[in-house]
Amino acid sequence: MKYRLLAVSGLAAGLALSAAACSSSSSPSAASGPGSSASAPPAAAAAVNFGPACSAVPKSGAGSFSGMATAPVATAASANPALSTLVAAVKAAGLVDTLNSASNITVFAPDNAAFAKIPPATLKKVLADKAELTKILTYHVAGARYTPDHLASGPAIKTLEGATVMPSMMGGTYEVNNAHVVCGNVQTANATVYIIDTVLMPPSS
C-alpha cells in the first residue's frame, strides 16, 4: 500500500535526527560511510540554518539551535516539538542509542506534518513493525555529514538502509527525493539534520 510504503520509509534514523555540516570544500562523496573523515569541524555548529520552518524552532532551551548543537541527534530531536512523531518512531525501532552513538551522520528528519500525511491506522501499524520501521528510518540517515552545497549540486547520497536518496535544488528550495527541506543545516553534536515535509520511501519497499 502506497501510504504504508511512505510510512515505512519514515525515518527511523530520521527520528533520531542530528546535524553538523562540514565545509563545502570537504563535502563527502556519496559513498562515504559512518564516521567518515569528512565530518564538520566544531565551528560548523555556527552554520547558517535555512527554510521556512526554522522560525518555529524554540529561541532558547534544549530545543533551540544552540541547545541542539550540544546534544547527540536523537536527544536533540526529542527537544524539538516539531519532531515528536519521529522521536516516537525512533524509540519504537530501538534506534535511540544507535543514533546517539553514531559519528558524523546526516539525518533527513520528517516533521510531524510529514507523518500526518499518513493515515493514522497505517502509521500505527508501521510503528508496531520494528523491522519495517527500522528500514524506513535508516533510509533517512547517511553515514557522513553533508553540506547544503552538496544537496544543491545533486550527487546521490547513500543511506544506512543501503539505497540512495537524490538531493537537488528547485526554484531555490532544497529537496530530497520528493520531499522539501523546511529547515536545513541544523547542527547536533554528532549530526547535521535537514527537516523535511514528507516521509521518504526506500525503493525496495
Q: What role is predicted for each listed range?
A:
Residues 2-205:
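Mature, structured domains of secreted/extracytosolic soluble proteins
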